[in-house]
Amino acid sequence: MDQRLKKALKHADYVTTFKNQKRALKEKFSKDTTVYYCGGQFTATREFISSVLSLRCDIFVDNNSTPIKIKDKEDFYNVLVEAFTKASEEYYTEYKKIVNSERTVQGILDV
């Protein structure tokens, strides 16, 4: 096989593996930012976190379109911030490991 073709195939495998690893990280981040509170399921996003304390209303619609009354908005806010912060830090750390790994399929898989 031509050396250039081998190199191109090796790079294509690397890119595919990198994208798969990145997709897996995104899925984990999405799972880690899911918060269950007062019987509801919420996703901790920057926008949602910002709205929690700024709104006067204490009823929030969860991911399943169910209205949930939040009795302690301060605690709810803290739970959301903690989940988002922890998930973001872990996502960043794991992503950096992939990016800085050896540029081979095995290098990415060893992370």
Predicted regions and their residues:
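A preference for well-ordered globular domain cores
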Residues: M1-V111
